[in-house]
Every structure is written in structure tokens, then in C-alpha cells.
């Protein structure tokens, strides 16, 4: 015992010296990578500024954005041993988004996304693997499948709107829309993607697991039992297993010659027609992509639908024009669904949806990791291993006419700012990893705006900071969009 204490005492100076050397080198390497870019002069050892990020994500990123204004549109920081760069300038963001390849950048979706979502996630693929999966996925978002999805979307949306009528339309008490919309979106994505293969109990399990996954994206990445991040990883594993069962059932159904009724059916139907099957078409590989899709459609769509309600309530003239636009084609009394042609003709409502996505893009930024040194500007080269955050939010307020104003007419056929400032509208990303389901997401938002605004009057419960942005993990209003709801019509379908 004495000898052990003596040994430890003799080693203590060396251990302390090694620790001090490590801390010194950590600060030195940070300063070398930082160069002359704005950011903290010194960072907290090992963990960096991750506590500030988790405590108040909005404030953290606002400060990074403000610092970027003092340079060429870049600022830096340090998170759990990772040097990070925040990109505010839209052109520099495009440069990152269009260079996802083995010698430049890899999309991560989250600073610790690969550990959370797993190796088979579409998020982390590039090169031929990514092209192969995209070739399989893209046909599932063309006109015929989208038309089938639209009917499913509307059935679910109307079911939830009727439930809201029964529960809240008296207008006697306010309701926070966030949880209502989240439940609507989760059922919609389950129904559209794998609907026939889920029973009530499995749907509940999926809902719980996605809640854990959402919490995991905002937690300190400690992958141990009892920690939120570790529980989120386990939730992802369960979701992949659940989706794998659905894929297997779909393949059997399509092999029997039945018609596709949901996204996984359209996908497996095309796989069965190929001989031999294409790469990355095993049950687990497809299920990993479905988990990605459902996660994106749930949280991103919850954000966009929430902000749609916020903006429609605060812009009475926009709401009036939406109702007028929709009334030309659809009424909640008609007992009919909106057709694909009618949806395409709701041009003002579609412009409102695009402006919601510009004004409040659900994912404010998309993390990438530099897989090699990359020269971003004439004066700065991004070091290998850096996590880069191109800001889709900041890009949306560059170039556009009066960008701080909510103005759907900017997307009219006359002004066409979506084409004029195409490189600034990055809500769905850019380059090879641009969102493959963007037409589906846009249709979902347009359908919700059309039906919700036609069936309800709604009045916001205003409070200090209610419109402030919070990241949970996508952008949402701080109050969860609390409103009084009341029915516009005596009857509904």
C-alpha cells in the first residue's frame, strides 16, 4: 500500500506536466486553426463551449452569426474536442453543399450524427453508394406516387382537424399547437411511408422512440445507459428493426402482384422488377433510409406547419387571400379530397408555403465535416476534421427583396424571386444531398395551410417573446404557437 502511494506520488509531477502540456497544445491547435477568424480567444478545456450550446442553442448560434458579420461571413468555436466553423455567407454555404465528396466534405446532419444514426444512414453516404440509393429513392417522389401520398396525407390531416374541432373549436381555452401538429405529422409519415404494415401498438412505440431520438439530438453525446444520447441510440436501433419488418412484408406483398399503396411499396415494387436486385436494397438498408425520412418529415414538417399558423395569424391579408385561393377549388363541406391538378393551381397558397420555408427554414443549418483540408476562400483553408455549419437561415435573408418582410408575392410568376435568388433559397439544401422528398414536403405544407385555414379561425395568445426562435431541434416559436381555435363552418366533412 505504501509503495503504491509512493509510486503515485513520484508520478504525480509527470502526470500534471502531461495534463498541462495537453491543455496547452489544445489551446495552441485551436488558435492555429482559428487564425484571424472571429471566435473565442480561448476555449474551455476538452468540452469547449458545448454547455452554452445545450443551455441556449438560439443564443449560441445568434452570437456565431453576429461574429461572422465582422469577417468574410465566417466565425469559429470549439465543441467537445471539435473545431467548428459557422458559415453565414450564402455563396460560401453553397460551396460546401456542392462539394460533398471523399476529398472535400461529408454531410453529418448532427455534430455526432454518425454515432447517433448509424453507418447505413443515407445522410452519411457519398459517391457511388449515395448515387445508387438516390436512384432507387427518387422515383418514389414523382407524380404518380405523390398523387397517392396526397390522398393519404389529406385523410390524416382531415382526421386530426376534425378531432381539433371536437376538442378545441369552442374557443374557450387556448391550445399549444406544437404537440397537436407533431402528432399529425407523425401519423402522416407513418401512413404514407409504411402505413399498412403498422398496428396501433407499433405506432405508439414508434412515436415514443422518435421522441427519444429528438431529445438525443439536443443532448450531450454520452453513449452510456441512463443518458439521453445513449437512449436515443437504442431508439434508433429499435426503429430500424421495426422498419425492417415493414420492408419484408412489403416485398412479400409486391412479389404477390399487389398494387403499391405507400412509399415502401413503390420502392420494393421497383426492386423486385430488377434482376439482380440493386445495391443497398436489403431490408435493413432500406429501413435505415425510412428512419431518416420519418425523422426529417416529423420534426421539419412540425416546424414548417407551426410557422405557417404563426404567419397566417399575424398577416390577416395573407390569410384572406389563401382562403380565397383555396375556395376556388375546395370546401370542407364538399366531402371530396383536393386533386393533384387543384393543388397545382393553388398558386398563392403554394407561394405562402414557400415563403414560410424561406422565412423560417426548419433546419437552420446543416453540419458537414471536412474530410480533407479545403480552401474555402482566398485567405482561409478549412482544416481536415473541422465541423462546418452552413447556415440556411442566414442565407434566406440575403439577396431577397426586403428579406425581413414576410411577402409571399416574392414567389409570384411576376417576381420569381425563387429563381432570381435560387442560390439563397437553401431550405432543402443544394448539391448531391439536396432533399429528395422536397416535393412531398411542399405538398404536405400546402395541403395543411389550405385545409386548416379553411376550417378554422384562430387567434394567437400573445406573450413576451412568443415569436422567439427555439431549436427543439428544428426551429419553432418559443410558445409552441398557443392559439384559440374556433370552427369557421357549422359543418365539416
From Swiss-Prot:
Induction: Not induced by pathogen infection. InterPro entries: Cyt_P450 (IPR001128), Cyt_P450_CS (IPR017972), Cyt_P450_E_grp-I (IPR002401), Cyt_P450_sf (IPR036396). PROSITE patterns: CYTOCHROME_P450. The chain crosses the membrane at residues 5-25. The keyword Magnesium does not apply. Keywords: Heme, Iron, Lipid biosynthesis, Lipid metabolism, Membrane, Metal-binding, Monooxygenase, NADP, Oxidoreductase, Steroid biosynthesis, Steroid metabolism, Sterol biosynthesis, Sterol metabolism, Transmembrane, Transmembrane helix. Very weak expression in roots and root hairs. Not detected in the root tips. The keyword GTP-binding does not apply. Heme binds at residue 435. GO terms for molecular function: C-22 sterol desaturase (NADPH) activity; heme binding; iron ion binding; monooxygenase activity. Pathway: Steroid biosynthesis; sterol biosynthesis. One of its GO terms (biological process) is sterol biosynthetic process. Gene3D superfamilies: Cytochrome P450. It catalyses: 5-dehydroepisterol + NADPH + O2 + H(+) = ergosta-5,7,22,24(28)-tetraen-3beta-ol + NADP(+) + 2 H2O. GO terms for cellular component: membrane. Its EC number is 1.14.19.41. It is an enzyme of class 1 (oxidoreductase). It is a single-pass membrane protein. Plants overexpressing CYP710A4 show higher levels of stigmasterol and lower levels of beta-sitosterol than the wild-type. Belongs to the cytochrome P450 family. This is Cytochrome P450 710A4. It comes from Arabidopsis thaliana (Mouse-ear cress). The gene is CYP710A4.
Amino acid at each position: 500500500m505504501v509503495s503504491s502511494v509512493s509510486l503515485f506520488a513520484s508520478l504525480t509531477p509527470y502526470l500534471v506536466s502531461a495534463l498541462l502540456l495537453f491543455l496547452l497544445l489544445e489551446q495552441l491547435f485551436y488558435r492555429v486553426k482559428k487564425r484571424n477568424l472571429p471566435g473565442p480567444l480561448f476555449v474551455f478545456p476538452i468540452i469547449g463551449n458545448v454547455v452554452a450550446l445545450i443551455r441556449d442553442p438560439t443564443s449560441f448560434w445568434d452570437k456565431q452569426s453576429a461574429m461572422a458579420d465582422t469577417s468574410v461571413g465566417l466565425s469559429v468555436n470549439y465543441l467537445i474536442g471539435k473545431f467548428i466553423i459557422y458559415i453565414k455567407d450564402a455563396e460560401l454555404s453553397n460551396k460546401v453543399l456542392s462539394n460533398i465528396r471523399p476529398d472535400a466534405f461529408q454531410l453529418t446532419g448532427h455534430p455526432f450524427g454518425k454515432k447517433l444514426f448509424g453507418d447505413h444512414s443515407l445522410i452519411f453516404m457519398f459517391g457511388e453508394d449515395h448515387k445508387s440509393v438516390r436512384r432507387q429513392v427518387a422515383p418514389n417522389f414523382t407524380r404518380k406516387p405523390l398523387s397517392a401520398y396526397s390522398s393519404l396525407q389529406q385523410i390524416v390531416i382531415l382526421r386530426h382537424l376534425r378531432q381539433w374541432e371536437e376538442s378545441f373549436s369552442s374557443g374557450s381555452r387556448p391550445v399549444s399547437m406544437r404537440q397537436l401538429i407533431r402528432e399529425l405529422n407523425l401519423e402522416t409519415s407513418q401512413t404514407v411511408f409504411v402505413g399498412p404494415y403498422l398496428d396501433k401498438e407499433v405506432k405508439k412505440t414508434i412515436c415514443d422512440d422518435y421522441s427519444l431520438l429528438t431529445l438525443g439530438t439536443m443532448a450531450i453525446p454520452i453513449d452510456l445507459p441512463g443518458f439521453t444520447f445513449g437512449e436515443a441510440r437504442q431508439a434508433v436501433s429499435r426503429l430500424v428493426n421495426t422498419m425492417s419488418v415493414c420492408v419484408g412484408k412489403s416485398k412479400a406483398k409486391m412479389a404477390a402482384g399487389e398494387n403499391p399503396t405507400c412509399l415502401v411499396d413503390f420502392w420494393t415494387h421497383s426492386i423486385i422488377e430488377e434482376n439482380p436486385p440493386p445495391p443497398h436494397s436489403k431490408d435493413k438498408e432500406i429501413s435505415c433510409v425510412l428512419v431518416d425520412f420519418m425523422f426529417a418529415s416529423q420534426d421539419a414538417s412540425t416546424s414548417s406547419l407551426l410557422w405557417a399558423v404563426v404567419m397566417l395569424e399575424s398577416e390577416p391579408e395573407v390569410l384572406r387571400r389563401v382562403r380565397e385561393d383555396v375556395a376556388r377549388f375546395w370546401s370542407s363541406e364538399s366531402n371530396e379530397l383536393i386533386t393533384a391538378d387543384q393543388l397545382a393551381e393553388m398558386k398563392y397558397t403554394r407561394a405562402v408555403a414557400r415563403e414560410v420555408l424561406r422565412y423560417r427554414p426548419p433546419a437552420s443549418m446543416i453540419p458537414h465535416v471536412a474530410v480533407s483540408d479545403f480552401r474555402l476562400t482566398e485567405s482561409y483553408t478549412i482544416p481536415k476534421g473541422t465541423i462546418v455549419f452552413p447556415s440556411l437561415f442566414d442565407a434566406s435573408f440575403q439577396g431577397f427583396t426586403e428579406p425581413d418582410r414576410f411577402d409571399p408575392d416574392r414567389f409570384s410568376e411576376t417576381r420569381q424571386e425563387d429563381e432570381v435568388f435560387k442560390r439563397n433559397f437553401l431550405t432543402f439544401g443544394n448539391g448531391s444531398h439536396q432533399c429528395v422528398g422536397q416535393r412531398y414536403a411542399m405538398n404536405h405544407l400546402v395541403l395543411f395551410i389550405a385545409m386548416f385555414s379553411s376550417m378554422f379561425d384562430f387567434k394567437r395568445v400573445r406573450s413576451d417573446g412568443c415569436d422567439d426562435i427555439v431549436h427543439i431541434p428544428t426551429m419553432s416559436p418559443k410558445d409552441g404557437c398557443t392559439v384559440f381555435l374556433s370552427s369557421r363552418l357549422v359543418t365539416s366533412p
